[in-house]
Protein backbone atom coordinates (compact mmCIF):
# COMPACT_ATOMS: atom_id res chain seq x y z
CA UNK A 1 0.00 0.00 0.00
CA UNK A 2 2.98 2.31 0.64
CA UNK A 3 4.08 1.72 -2.98
CA UNK A 4 0.62 2.73 -4.21
CA UNK A 5 0.73 6.09 -2.42
CA UNK A 6 4.31 6.65 -3.61
CA UNK A 7 3.14 6.06 -7.19
CA UNK A 8 0.82 9.05 -6.70
CA UNK A 9 3.86 11.27 -6.21
CA UNK A 10 3.98 11.30 -2.40
CA UNK A 11 7.20 11.17 -0.38
CA UNK A 12 7.99 7.92 1.43
CA UNK A 13 7.13 9.42 4.84
CA UNK A 14 3.68 10.61 3.72
CA UNK A 15 3.02 7.37 1.82
CA UNK A 16 4.00 5.25 4.83
CA UNK A 17 1.82 7.32 7.18
CA UNK A 18 -1.24 7.17 4.92
CA UNK A 19 -0.73 3.44 4.30
CA UNK A 20 -0.61 2.82 8.06
CA UNK A 21 -3.80 4.83 8.67
CA UNK A 22 -5.55 3.06 5.77
CA UNK A 23 -4.48 -0.33 7.13
CA UNK A 24 -5.79 0.52 10.60
CA UNK A 25 -9.14 1.64 9.17
CA UNK A 26 -9.36 -1.49 7.00
CA UNK A 27 -9.15 -3.55 10.20
CA UNK A 28 -11.02 -1.35 12.70
CA UNK A 29 -14.13 -0.54 10.62
CA UNK A 30 -14.89 -4.13 9.46
CA UNK A 31 -14.14 -5.30 13.02
CA UNK A 32 -16.79 -2.96 14.44
CA UNK A 33 -19.28 -4.25 11.86
CA UNK A 34 -18.29 -7.83 12.73
CA UNK A 35 -18.79 -7.15 16.45
CA UNK A 36 -22.30 -5.83 15.77
CA UNK A 37 -23.11 -8.95 13.76
CA UNK A 38 -21.72 -11.43 16.31
CA UNK A 39 -23.73 -9.76 19.08
CA UNK A 40 -26.80 -10.41 16.92
CA UNK A 41 -25.63 -13.99 16.24
CA UNK A 42 -24.98 -14.54 19.95
CA UNK A 43 -28.52 -13.52 20.83
CA UNK A 44 -29.97 -15.67 18.04
CA UNK A 45 -28.02 -18.74 19.20
CA UNK A 46 -29.14 -18.28 22.82
CA UNK A 47 -32.72 -17.84 21.63
CA UNK A 48 -32.60 -21.00 19.50
CA UNK A 49 -31.25 -23.05 22.41
CA UNK A 50 -34.00 -21.67 24.67
CA UNK A 51 -36.66 -22.28 21.95
CA UNK A 52 -37.24 -18.55 21.46
CA UNK A 53 -37.12 -16.37 18.33
CA UNK A 54 -34.57 -13.78 19.47
CA UNK A 55 -34.22 -10.36 17.74
CA UNK A 56 -36.75 -10.30 14.89
CA UNK A 57 -38.26 -6.80 14.65
CA UNK A 58 -35.61 -4.25 13.61
CA UNK A 59 -34.74 -4.88 9.96
CA UNK A 60 -35.06 -8.19 8.07
CA UNK A 61 -34.77 -11.09 10.53
CA UNK A 62 -33.75 -8.56 13.20
CA UNK A 63 -30.36 -7.95 11.55
CA UNK A 64 -30.37 -4.25 12.46
CA UNK A 65 -31.07 -4.82 16.16
CA UNK A 66 -27.43 -4.29 17.19
CA UNK A 67 -27.30 -0.97 15.31
CA UNK A 68 -30.54 0.15 16.98
CA UNK A 69 -29.07 -0.74 20.38
CA UNK A 70 -25.91 1.20 19.51
CA UNK A 71 -27.95 4.26 18.55
CA UNK A 72 -29.91 3.97 21.79
CA UNK A 73 -26.83 3.99 24.04
CA UNK A 74 -25.24 6.77 21.94
CA UNK A 75 -28.23 9.03 22.66
CA UNK A 76 -28.31 8.26 26.38
CA UNK A 77 -26.84 10.56 29.02
CA UNK A 78 -23.49 9.58 30.52
CA UNK A 79 -24.03 9.48 34.28
CA UNK A 80 -20.96 9.60 36.52
CA UNK A 81 -21.50 8.65 40.20
CA UNK A 82 -20.86 11.53 42.58
CA UNK A 83 -18.18 9.62 44.49
CA UNK A 84 -16.36 8.31 41.41
CA UNK A 85 -12.91 9.36 40.24
CA UNK A 86 -14.05 11.13 37.08
CA UNK A 87 -10.84 10.86 35.04
CA UNK A 88 -10.15 7.19 35.72
CA UNK A 89 -13.86 6.36 35.42
CA UNK A 90 -13.96 7.70 31.86
CA UNK A 91 -10.58 6.39 30.70
CA UNK A 92 -11.17 2.76 31.83
CA UNK A 93 -13.59 1.77 29.00
CA UNK A 94 -11.35 3.56 26.47
CA UNK A 95 -8.39 1.40 27.58
CA UNK A 96 -10.46 -1.79 27.32
CA UNK A 97 -11.74 -0.92 23.85
CA UNK A 98 -8.37 0.28 22.50
CA UNK A 99 -6.46 -2.77 23.74
CA UNK A 100 -9.08 -5.04 22.14
CA UNK A 101 -8.36 -3.41 18.75
CA UNK A 102 -4.55 -3.29 18.99
CA UNK A 103 -4.09 -7.06 19.06
CA UNK A 104 -5.62 -7.40 15.57
CA UNK A 105 -2.59 -5.69 13.99
CA UNK A 106 -0.68 -8.99 13.68
CA UNK A 107 -3.57 -11.32 12.75
CA UNK A 108 -3.03 -12.79 9.23
CA UNK A 109 -6.29 -12.94 7.24
CA UNK A 110 -4.59 -14.55 4.25
CA UNK A 111 -1.05 -15.21 3.08
CA UNK A 112 0.64 -11.84 3.60
CA UNK A 113 -2.67 -10.07 4.38
CA UNK A 114 -1.63 -8.65 7.76
CA UNK A 115 -1.20 -5.08 8.96
CA UNK A 116 2.10 -5.70 10.81
CA UNK A 117 3.95 -8.87 9.78
CA UNK A 118 6.43 -8.81 12.68
CA UNK A 119 8.67 -11.66 13.80
CA UNK A 120 7.33 -11.58 17.36
CA UNK A 121 3.63 -11.44 16.48
CA UNK A 122 2.55 -14.04 19.03
CA UNK A 123 4.58 -12.35 21.77
CA UNK A 124 2.95 -9.04 20.79
CA UNK A 125 -0.52 -10.54 21.24
CA UNK A 126 0.38 -11.88 24.70
CA UNK A 127 1.78 -8.48 25.71
CA UNK A 128 -1.21 -6.50 24.41
CA UNK A 129 -3.82 -8.87 25.86
CA UNK A 130 -2.24 -8.54 29.31
CA UNK A 131 -2.94 -4.78 29.21
CA UNK A 132 -6.71 -5.34 29.10
CA UNK A 133 -6.80 -6.00 32.84
CA UNK A 134 -5.86 -2.36 33.52
CA UNK A 135 -9.16 -1.10 32.15
CA UNK A 136 -11.06 -3.55 34.35
CA UNK A 137 -9.10 -2.67 37.51
CA UNK A 138 -9.47 1.07 36.89
CA UNK A 139 -13.22 0.77 36.32
CA UNK A 140 -13.69 -1.15 39.57
CA UNK A 141 -11.55 1.26 41.58
CA UNK A 142 -12.84 4.50 40.04
CA UNK A 143 -16.54 3.58 40.43
CA UNK A 144 -16.25 3.90 44.24
CA UNK A 145 -18.79 1.09 44.65
CA UNK A 146 -18.38 -2.30 46.30
CA UNK A 147 -19.83 -4.41 43.49
CA UNK A 148 -17.52 -3.08 40.72
CA UNK A 149 -14.57 -3.23 43.14
CA UNK A 150 -15.11 -6.91 44.01
CA UNK A 151 -15.69 -7.69 40.33
CA UNK A 152 -12.43 -5.96 39.35
CA UNK A 153 -10.52 -8.01 41.94
CA UNK A 154 -12.02 -11.21 40.54
CA UNK A 155 -11.38 -10.21 36.94
CA UNK A 156 -7.74 -9.28 37.52
CA UNK A 157 -7.00 -12.53 39.36
CA UNK A 158 -8.84 -14.58 36.72
CA UNK A 159 -7.18 -12.95 33.70
CA UNK A 160 -3.68 -13.08 35.18
CA UNK A 161 -4.13 -16.72 36.27
CA UNK A 162 -5.15 -17.96 32.84
CA UNK A 163 -2.61 -15.83 30.97
CA UNK A 164 0.11 -17.89 32.67
CA UNK A 165 -1.39 -21.14 31.33
CA UNK A 166 -1.98 -19.61 27.89
CA UNK A 167 1.67 -18.55 27.75
CA UNK A 168 2.91 -22.08 28.40
CA UNK A 169 0.35 -23.57 25.99
CA UNK A 170 1.56 -21.29 23.20
CA UNK A 171 5.18 -22.29 23.81
CA UNK A 172 4.20 -25.71 22.42
CA UNK A 173 2.91 -24.07 19.24
CA UNK A 174 6.10 -22.00 18.90
CA UNK A 175 8.28 -25.11 19.34
CA UNK A 176 6.52 -26.92 16.48
CA UNK A 177 6.28 -23.86 14.20
CA UNK A 178 9.84 -22.72 15.07
CA UNK A 179 8.65 -19.10 14.87
CA UNK A 180 6.72 -16.36 16.70
CA UNK A 181 5.55 -14.93 13.37
CA UNK A 182 1.80 -15.52 12.91
CA UNK A 183 2.11 -16.10 9.15
CA UNK A 184 4.87 -18.65 9.67
CA UNK A 185 2.82 -20.45 12.33
CA UNK A 186 -0.02 -20.88 9.82
CA UNK A 187 2.34 -22.04 7.06
CA UNK A 188 3.94 -24.58 9.42
CA UNK A 189 0.53 -26.29 9.74
CA UNK A 190 0.28 -27.15 6.03
CA UNK A 191 0.01 -30.93 5.79
CA UNK A 192 1.04 -31.26 9.45
CA UNK A 193 -1.76 -33.53 10.67
CA UNK A 194 -1.32 -37.07 9.32
CA UNK A 195 0.38 -35.55 6.26
CA UNK A 196 -2.91 -34.31 4.77
CA UNK A 197 -4.60 -32.12 7.42
CA UNK A 198 -3.64 -28.44 7.67
CA UNK A 199 -3.81 -28.16 11.45
CA UNK A 200 -1.68 -28.55 14.55
CA UNK A 201 -4.83 -29.73 16.34
CA UNK A 202 -4.56 -33.19 14.72
CA UNK A 203 -1.14 -33.72 16.28
CA UNK A 204 -1.54 -35.99 19.32
CA UNK A 205 0.95 -33.88 21.28
CA UNK A 206 -0.76 -30.58 20.44
CA UNK A 207 -4.42 -31.62 20.64
CA UNK A 208 -4.53 -31.46 24.48
CA UNK A 209 -2.98 -27.99 24.26
CA UNK A 210 -5.66 -26.97 21.73
CA UNK A 211 -8.41 -28.08 24.14
CA UNK A 212 -6.78 -26.28 27.08
CA UNK A 213 -6.35 -23.14 24.97
CA UNK A 214 -10.04 -23.18 24.00
CA UNK A 215 -11.12 -23.47 27.65
CA UNK A 216 -8.57 -20.85 28.74
CA UNK A 217 -9.95 -18.54 26.03
CA UNK A 218 -13.37 -18.74 27.69
CA UNK A 219 -11.80 -17.85 31.04
CA UNK A 220 -9.63 -15.08 29.58
CA UNK A 221 -12.67 -13.37 28.05
CA UNK A 222 -14.80 -13.99 31.18
CA UNK A 223 -17.41 -15.91 29.19
CA UNK A 224 -19.66 -18.52 30.77
CA UNK A 225 -19.03 -20.81 32.56
CA UNK A 226 -16.25 -18.51 33.83
CA UNK A 227 -18.23 -15.24 33.98
CA UNK A 228 -17.55 -14.76 37.70
CA UNK A 229 -16.81 -11.08 37.08
CA UNK A 230 -20.42 -10.40 36.06
CA UNK A 231 -22.27 -12.95 38.19
CA UNK A 232 -25.67 -11.22 38.30
CA UNK A 233 -26.80 -12.92 41.52
CA UNK A 234 -23.64 -11.76 43.34
CA UNK A 235 -22.24 -8.63 41.68
CA UNK A 236 -25.16 -7.10 39.71
CA UNK A 237 -23.33 -6.22 36.43
CA UNK A 238 -19.80 -6.50 37.81
CA UNK A 239 -17.29 -3.77 37.04
CA UNK A 240 -19.74 -2.27 34.51
CA UNK A 241 -22.46 -1.66 37.13
CA UNK A 242 -22.03 2.13 37.37
CA UNK A 243 -21.54 2.70 33.63
CA UNK A 244 -24.08 3.98 31.13
CA UNK A 245 -24.31 5.37 27.61
CA UNK A 246 -21.20 5.14 25.39
CA UNK A 247 -18.92 4.21 28.31
CA UNK A 248 -20.94 1.03 28.80
CA UNK A 249 -21.02 0.45 25.03
CA UNK A 250 -17.21 0.64 24.83
CA UNK A 251 -16.93 -2.11 27.45
CA UNK A 252 -19.45 -4.18 25.49
CA UNK A 253 -17.61 -3.66 22.18
CA UNK A 254 -14.25 -4.43 23.80
CA UNK A 255 -15.61 -7.64 25.33
CA UNK A 256 -16.95 -8.96 22.03
CA UNK A 257 -13.84 -7.84 20.12
CA UNK A 258 -11.82 -9.93 22.59
CA UNK A 259 -14.15 -12.90 22.09
CA UNK A 260 -13.71 -12.58 18.32
CA UNK A 261 -9.93 -12.32 18.80
CA UNK A 262 -9.83 -15.50 20.89
CA UNK A 263 -11.92 -17.36 18.29
CA UNK A 264 -9.46 -16.15 15.63
CA UNK A 265 -6.43 -17.25 17.68
CA UNK A 266 -7.94 -20.71 18.13
CA UNK A 267 -8.34 -20.93 14.35
CA UNK A 268 -4.91 -19.48 13.48
CA UNK A 269 -2.73 -21.22 16.07
CA UNK A 270 -4.21 -24.73 16.06
CA UNK A 271 -6.55 -25.22 13.11
CA UNK A 272 -4.75 -23.87 10.06
CA UNK A 273 -5.92 -20.26 9.94
CA UNK A 274 -6.50 -19.29 6.30
CA UNK A 275 -5.46 -22.74 5.01
CA UNK A 276 -8.19 -25.18 3.87
CA UNK A 277 -8.85 -28.08 6.26
CA UNK A 278 -7.32 -30.67 3.89
CA UNK A 279 -4.07 -30.24 1.95
CA UNK A 280 -5.81 -30.87 -1.40
CA UNK A 281 -5.15 -28.62 -4.40
CA UNK A 282 -8.82 -27.89 -5.43
CA UNK A 283 -9.57 -26.53 -1.94
CA UNK A 284 -6.93 -23.82 -2.37
CA UNK A 285 -9.16 -22.26 -5.06
CA UNK A 286 -11.34 -20.94 -2.22
CA UNK A 287 -9.89 -17.64 -0.88
CA UNK A 288 -8.05 -18.13 2.40
CA UNK A 289 -10.06 -15.45 4.16
CA UNK A 290 -13.24 -17.53 3.58
CA UNK A 291 -11.67 -20.54 5.33
CA UNK A 292 -10.55 -18.33 8.22
CA UNK A 293 -14.00 -16.77 8.65
CA UNK A 294 -15.64 -20.22 8.59
CA UNK A 295 -13.34 -21.41 11.39
CA UNK A 296 -13.92 -18.22 13.41
CA UNK A 297 -17.70 -18.67 13.11
CA UNK A 298 -17.40 -22.28 14.25
CA UNK A 299 -15.49 -21.31 17.38
CA UNK A 300 -17.87 -18.44 18.07
CA UNK A 301 -20.77 -20.91 17.91
CA UNK A 302 -18.91 -23.09 20.46
CA UNK A 303 -18.45 -20.04 22.73
CA UNK A 304 -22.18 -19.19 22.52
CA UNK A 305 -23.25 -22.81 22.93
CA UNK A 306 -21.16 -23.19 26.08
CA UNK A 307 -22.49 -19.91 27.49
CA UNK A 308 -26.08 -21.00 26.98
CA UNK A 309 -25.74 -24.53 28.36
CA UNK A 310 -22.92 -24.91 30.92
CA UNK A 311 -23.56 -23.78 34.53
CA UNK A 312 -21.24 -21.22 36.12
CA UNK A 313 -18.18 -22.42 38.06
CA UNK A 314 -17.58 -21.39 41.66
CA UNK A 315 -14.64 -19.04 42.11
CA UNK A 316 -12.51 -21.64 43.91
CA UNK A 317 -13.18 -24.14 41.09
CA UNK A 318 -12.10 -21.53 38.54
CA UNK A 319 -8.80 -20.89 40.32
CA UNK A 320 -8.18 -24.60 40.89
CA UNK A 321 -8.66 -25.36 37.20
CA UNK A 322 -6.15 -22.70 36.20
CA UNK A 323 -3.42 -23.22 38.80
CA UNK A 324 -3.70 -26.91 39.75
CA UNK A 325 -4.72 -28.50 36.44
CA UNK A 326 -3.88 -26.39 33.38
CA UNK A 327 -0.58 -24.96 34.61
CA UNK A 328 1.02 -28.32 35.64
CA UNK A 329 -0.26 -30.10 32.53
CA UNK A 330 0.99 -27.36 30.20
CA UNK A 331 4.42 -27.44 31.88
CA UNK A 332 4.66 -31.23 31.57
CA UNK A 333 3.54 -30.99 27.93
CA UNK A 334 6.33 -28.52 27.14
CA UNK A 335 8.88 -31.08 28.35
CA UNK A 336 7.19 -33.84 26.30
CA UNK A 337 7.16 -31.71 23.14
CA UNK A 338 10.77 -30.62 23.68
CA UNK A 339 11.88 -34.24 24.10
CA UNK A 340 9.93 -35.36 21.04
CA UNK A 341 11.44 -32.62 18.86
CA UNK A 342 14.94 -33.34 20.16
CA UNK A 343 14.57 -36.99 19.12
CA UNK A 344 12.88 -36.41 15.76
CA UNK A 345 13.76 -32.98 14.37
CA UNK A 346 17.10 -32.08 15.96
CA UNK A 347 18.75 -35.46 16.51
Curated annotation (Swiss-Prot):
Pfam family, one: NADHdh
EC numbers for this chain: 7.1.1.-
UniProt KW Hydrolase keyword: no
Topology of this chain in the membrane: Multi-pass membrane protein
Residue stretches spanning the membrane: 21-41, 87-107, 118-138, 157-177, 195-215, 258-278, 283-303, 323-343
GO MF: NADH dehydrogenase activity; oxidoreductase activity, acting on NAD(P)H, quinone or similar compound as acceptor; quinone binding
Broadest EC class assigned to this enzyme: translocase
GO terms, biological process: aerobic respiration
Gene Ontology annotations for the cellular component aspect, listed alphabetically: plasma membrane
Record bears the keyword Cell inner membrane: yes
Record keywords, A-Z: Cell inner membrane, Cell membrane, Membrane, NAD, Quinone, Translocase, Transmembrane, Transmembrane helix, Ubiquinone
Record's catalysed reaction(s): a quinone + NADH + 5 H(+)(in) = a quinol + NAD(+) + 4 H(+)(out)
Location(s) in or outside the cell: Cell inner membrane
Annotated function: NDH-1 shuttles electrons from NADH, via FMN and iron-sulfur (Fe-S) centers, to quinones in the respiratory chain. The immediate electron acceptor for the enzyme in this species is believed to be ubiquinone. Couples the redox reaction to proton translocation (for every two electrons transferred, four hydrogen ions are translocated across the cytoplasmic membrane), and thus conserves the redox energy in a proton gradient. This subunit may bind ubiquinone.
NCBIfam families: PRK06076.1-2 (NF004741), PRK06076.1-6 (NF004745)
Record family assignment: Belongs to the complex I subunit 1 family.
Subunit description: NDH-1 is composed of 14 different subunits. Subunits NuoA, H, J, K, L, M, N constitute the membrane sector of the complex.
Protein's name in the database: NADH-quinone oxidoreductase subunit H
Organism of provenance: Sphingopyxis alaskensis (strain DSM 13593 / LMG 18877 / RB2256)
Amino acid sequence: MTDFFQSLGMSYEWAWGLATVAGILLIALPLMLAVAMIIYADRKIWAAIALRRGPNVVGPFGLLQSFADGLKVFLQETIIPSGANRGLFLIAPIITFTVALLAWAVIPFNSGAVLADINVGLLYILAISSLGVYGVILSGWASNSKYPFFSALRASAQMISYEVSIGFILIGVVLFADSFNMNEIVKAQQGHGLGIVNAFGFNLLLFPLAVMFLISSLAETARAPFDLTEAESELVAGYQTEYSSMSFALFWLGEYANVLLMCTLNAVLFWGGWLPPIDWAPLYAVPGIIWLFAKILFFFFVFSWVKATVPRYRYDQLMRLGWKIFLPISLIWIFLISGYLMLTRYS
